[in-house]
């Protein structure tokens, strides 16, 4: 089953920030990766509420991002599809503000968006991720149908709507209460509005994992989501999974060649599961390191260094897109 491939092309990752993004370099590299097919580009917008956390406001620049993304509007042509993630991270619950934010985003970017994701990993309660934000379940459960109505009112009937999770649960200490909460929501109020589920898988990015264990961890994460979690939320096998975030870093104990080999294992494993698990989209995280000299995993997830010099994983990804991608 061919996959639609894509990438997170900007380099801001939570607190990890480095040199400013270079739109010309992004354009050159994405065009090279894309080839003649379609290609997904993932971007993030943040609702921080009032008053916003000062550090998040400084690094994430939500007002600036609501005006302009990393690349200009006209760039989203020639088969490039915008996957826009709306993150909910206020200091206090603010559902009214969140719903207004969704409306603002649709008014500004609805004409560009192909995939609209409501919340980022609401099952994952760590800082800088939506699962740690007060009111997150209500933000998800009310945000999805609100976005559907807003899209329909604006005439954007081709936008696919979803949310993402990080799985499997044992990597996170368990997320049973999250899925139980979705199980309690009548399908007409939530599940029937969902066009896809995003899955973030980083089996070897944040803990030591031998290379020969990576494929099994990928398969387990996909199977756990499809067979254990989604049925609880009234989401059937006909609802596609997007591998919306996946990557493996270079590190002091992982060479660029090893990064490339692990990435190939991950992508080939995901592709082998695509038909049985109904996986339709794969997005790599990400294009460029925020800070290549920093040994932290988040700062070296790129397939290019922080000056856009390709690592071996860049050529690997390009080859896999040509081999496994939808044309």
Regions found by a protein language model. Name each.
Residues 96, 167-198, 254, 258, ...:
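Substrate-binding cleft/loops of secretory-pathway carbohydrate-active enzymes
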Residues 104-135, 160-169, 201-203, 242-246, ...:
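Active-site groove signature of glycoside hydrolases
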Residues 29, 59-65, 155, 187, ...:
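Glycoside hydrolase catalytic-domain groove-lining segments
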Residues 4-32, 55-60, 75, 122-126, ...:
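Aromatic-rich peripheral "rim/lid" segments of glycoside hydrolase catalytic domains that contact
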Residues 16-33, 94-107, 173-187, 260-272:
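Short, acidic/polar
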Residues 3-9, 39-43, 80-86, 114-118, ...:
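Hydrophobic faces of well-ordered beta-strands that scaffold small-molecule active sites
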Residues 8, 87, 136-180, 230-251, ...:
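Aromatic-lined carbohydrate-recognition surfaces of secreted/lumenal glycan-active proteins
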Residues 26-109, 132-164, 211-218, 235-236:
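Aromatic-lined substrate-binding rim segments of carbohydrate-active enzymes
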């Amino acid at each position: 089953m061919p996959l639609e491939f894509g990438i997170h092309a900007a380099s801001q990752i939570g607190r990890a920030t480095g040199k400013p993004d270079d739109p010309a370099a992004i354009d050159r590299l994405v065009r090279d990766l894309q080839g003649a097919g379609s290609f997904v580009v993932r971007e993030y917008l943040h609702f921080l509420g009032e008053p916003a956390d000062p550090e998040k406001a400084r690094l994430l620049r939500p007002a600036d991002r609501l005006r302009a993304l990393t690349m200009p509007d006209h760039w989203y042509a020639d088969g490039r599809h915008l996957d826009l993630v709306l993150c909910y991270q206020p200091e206090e619950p603010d559902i009214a503000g969140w719903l207004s934010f969704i409306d603002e985003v649709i008014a500004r970017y609805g004409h560009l968006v192909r995939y609209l994701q409501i919340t980022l990993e609401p099952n994952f309660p760590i800082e800088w991720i939506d699962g740690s934000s007060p009111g997150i379940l209500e933000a998800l459960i009310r945000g999805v149908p609100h976005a559907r109505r807003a899209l329909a009112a604006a005439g954007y009937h081709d936008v696919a709507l979803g949310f993402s999770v990080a799985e499997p649960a044992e990597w996170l200490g368990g997320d049973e209460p999250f899925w139980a909460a979705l199980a309690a929501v009548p399908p007409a109020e939530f599940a029937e509005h969902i066009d896809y589920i995003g899955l973030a898988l980083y089996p070897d990015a944040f803990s030591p994992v031998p290379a020969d264990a990576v494929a099994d961890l990928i398969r387990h994460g996909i199977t756990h989501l499809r067979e254990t979690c989604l049925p609880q939320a009234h989401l059937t096998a006909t609802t596609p999974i997007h591998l919306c975030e996946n990557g493996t870093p270079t590190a002091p104990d992982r060479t660029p060649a090893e990064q490339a080999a692990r990435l190939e294992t991950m992508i080939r494993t995901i592709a082998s599961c695509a038909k049985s698990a109904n996986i339709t989209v794969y997005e790599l995280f990400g294009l460029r390191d925020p800070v290549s000299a920093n040994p932290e995993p988040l700062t070296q997830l790129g397939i290019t260094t922080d000056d856009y010099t390709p690592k071996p994983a860049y050529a690997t990804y390009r080859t896999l897109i040509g081999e496994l991608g939808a044309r």
